[in-house]
Structures are given as structure tokens and as C-alpha cells.
Amino acid sequence: DTNVIVSAMLKWDSIPGSILELALDGPITPVLNHEILEEYRQVLLRPKFHLTERIVGDLLDNISSRAVFADAHKLMLELPDPKDVVFYEVTMEQRKTEDTYLVTGNLKHFPSEHFVVTPRQMLDIIVNNEK
């Protein structure tokens, strides 16, 4: 979700940075919709992050070019942050046809499910699948 993207952009040499790199040029296929892209854009352009429109635009263009766009069906779900619901909805929609994970730095914000994982857990899953 958004915190992984922000963490990656603030510190590329990090586990979230590795996740983003794998999403841009590796085995991770981002699952998005336009609401998620707009959330990324709004958050990344906050002045405190010091990211330019060009940097954010290029990043989102690159993510979009590798992504699967899923039309999320609304779920009756209450989460601590209402803006997180769309990430869960898109994940659930894509899970109907593919093995899909929701990667977040805030596990406590989502239902406890085997497919809701931290960036570290996602890296472990990828490494184990490559063996």
C-alpha cells in the first residue's frame, strides 16, 4: 500500500525499496486501480517528502505500465483508515483469478490474512518461490 511506496521513495536502499524495484522490473506485478494511483500521487506530492511532480509522475507511469488494473467491488469492511479499504478490495478482486498479496507496513490496519504481508515477508515469499 501507500506506506511501502513512500518508504521506498524516501530510502531506496531498504526493504520497501527492494519491493518497489521488483515491482518496476521483476517478479512483482502491481495490482491497482485509478483510486490507488491518485492516492499514491497525493501522498507522494506532500511537501514534506520533497518529491517533484516529474519524479512522482515518472514513478507512477512506470508502475502503471507494469500493473494489472482491477475493478474493485465494494466490500462491507471497516478499517482504521478508510483509504485502505480500496487496497483490500483490489487485492480480493484479483485473488479470484491469481495468487495476489497486499504488501503493507501496517499489518494492524488490515484483516489478519495470509495474503496481507509486510515488505520483508513478501521478499521471503519471492525468494522461496525462486528455489
Predicted regions and their residues:
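A secondary-structure boundary/capping signal
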Residues: 1-2, 32-33, 106
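PIN/NYN-family metal-dependent endoribonuclease catalytic core
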Residues: 15-45
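Active-site neighborhoods of divalent-metal-dependent phosphate/nucleic-acid chemistry enzymes
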Residues: 59-105
